Amino acid sequence: MTFDINDKTAIITYEGSDTIGRPFLDEIIFNYKSFSSLNIIIDLTPMKSVLFKHIHDFTELASRHKEQSDKSFVIVSGPIALRLLPDGLNVVPTLHEALDTIEIEEIERDLGF
């Protein structure tokens, strides 16, 4: 996996050699303190086949991140049945949309929504 961290956002990208599932999530959690104060994007687009369970694995981390840091957590994924995803989990099809989602959520936080 690669970590691309700037002043507002950490983009964590899956690479083909990564083991998806718990090992992937565990590595993110292990490094979490280094980007816990930032918006987080998990980019799974390089993954050939994204399953519901791969997305669902991030539910707890996403919820905790939003509550504790008051920052955004967005997952970028290829085709997946959005109706099956837990409420409150942001999943979008492109990195551009992930960045747009973060921008909108930052505006909402600034306005007190």
Question: Across the structure, where does each feature detected by a protein language model lie?
Answer:
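Amphipathic, Lys/Arg-enriched alpha-helical "gate/interface" segment within cytosolic domains
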Residues: 2-113
